[in-house]
Amino acid sequence: MLVTYPALFYYDDTDGSATPYFVTFPDFEYSATQGENMADAMTMASDWLGVTLADYIENGRDIPTPSSINTLSLIDNDPFKNDDDFNLVYNPDKSFISMVVVDVAEYLGSQEPVKKTLTIPRWADTLGHELGLNFSQTLTDAIADKKIHA
């Protein structure tokens, strides 16, 4: 199941760092990852998001609602703006805000199937067969979707 969240990508090459991209997710407290280049930063951000969402789901934690990307600002959402001990220095021309997508199912723990017997209305069974649905996958996706969008 694909999930998207906005992320802030700050670029700082002032100290010659091997990982000039610093990435944070404003909807998750203490979120941070980094990348060597834009592609690596995007990959690392997706991986961080997948691991974090899987942890939230598996531990029954409430999943935050994604912020609207249109309401975010690199300046206003700077995670260190109120930290007197740290000043985030970045190049505004190479920094950006982007949506990050992840398939949460790839990060969830045990994929071992558990047999369930259920009853559904005849019309749903008929329609499901007409659509060629995999009923187990449909139920699995619906459960994950309910948790993520609760």
Features from the language model and the residues they span:
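A short, exposed loop/beta-hairpin motif centered on an aromatic-Gly-Thr core
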Residues: 29-40, 117
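A short, charged, amphipathic alpha-helix used as a generic interaction element across diverse proteins
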Residues: 39-51
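Short, proline-centered helix/strand-breaking motifs
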Residues: 26-29, 121
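N-terminal segment of the canonical double-stranded RNA-binding domain
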Residues: 1-19, 24, 106-108
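Short, charged, surface-exposed hinge/linker loops at domain edges
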Residues: 2-6, 50-119, 123-129, 137, ...
